[in-house]
């Protein structure tokens, strides 16, 4: 079977450090660093990934690039007495992943749009960049699209802030079931955050 154009793009992005993507990314990051934290773009950088997540080149769909800090939660060591367990030096689990933070920021920037999904496009020593696909639930083109009109329902509002996107469901532990995930349902907080 003949491989499609999207297949070649996908293969190049699987190992971006070893393909032509590396050189392109080096040039792009120089421009992206000078842009704002949420920047609307004309078309997706990774067209294969965007289309697999539901992107279509039609009215009512917007793509933005979001710049978020890298790294875990910084935690200053307490200078008073603590149990070792409560010092939080070995590990402090963040409530949201970096990708979820990017989705939430895009959601706040465009309050009339709804987050469909997001994907990684680059990183350096300080920042990570994600592209977030946003959909206008009130646009007639979206309302008439049988694949996307589910997002027009009132119950779907605020997907990104409620952890209903792919990154959100993964962070809440909804991607696995059964043994080992007893503390993630009905929610993380219902089990005193032991599921994290």
Curated annotation (Swiss-Prot):
GO terms for biological process: cytoplasmic translation. InterPro entries: Rbsml_eL15_core_dom_sf (IPR024794), Ribosomal_eL15 (IPR000439), Ribosomal_eL15_arc (IPR020926), Ribosomal_eL15_CS (IPR020925), Ribosomal_uL23/eL15/eS24_sf (IPR012678). Disulfide bonds: none annotated. One of its GO terms (molecular function) is RNA binding. Keywords: Ribonucleoprotein, Ribosomal protein. Residues 160-196 are annotated as: Disordered. HAMAP family: Ribosomal_eL15. Belongs to the eukaryotic ribosomal protein eL15 family. This is Large ribosomal subunit protein eL15. The gene is rpl15e.
């Amino acid at each position: 079977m003949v491989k499609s154009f999207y297949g070649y793009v996908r293969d190049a992005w699987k190992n971006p450090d070893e393909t032509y993507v590396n050189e392109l990314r080096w040039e792009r990051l120089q421009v992206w660093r000078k842009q704002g934290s949420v920047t609307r773009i004309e078309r997706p950088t990774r067209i294969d990934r965007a289309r697999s997540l539901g992107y279509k080149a039609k009215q009512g769909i917007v793509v933005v690039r979001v710049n978020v800090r890298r790294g875990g939660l910084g935690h200053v060591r307490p200078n008073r007495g603590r149990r070792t367990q409560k010092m939080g030096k070995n590990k402090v689990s963040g409530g949201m992943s970096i990708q979820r933070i990017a989705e939430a920021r895009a959601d706040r920037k465009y309050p009339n749009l709804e987050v469909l999904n997001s994907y990684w496009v680059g990183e350096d020593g300080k920042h990570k960049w994600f592209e977030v696909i946003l959909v206008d639930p009130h646009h007639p083109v979206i309302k008439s699209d049988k694949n996307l009109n589910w997002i027009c329902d009132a119950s779907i509002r605020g997907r990104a802030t409620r952890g209903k996107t792919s990154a959100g469901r993964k962070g809440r532990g909804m991607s696995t079931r059964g043994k080992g995930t007893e503390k993630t349902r009905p929610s993380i907080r219902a089990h005193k955050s032991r599921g994290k």
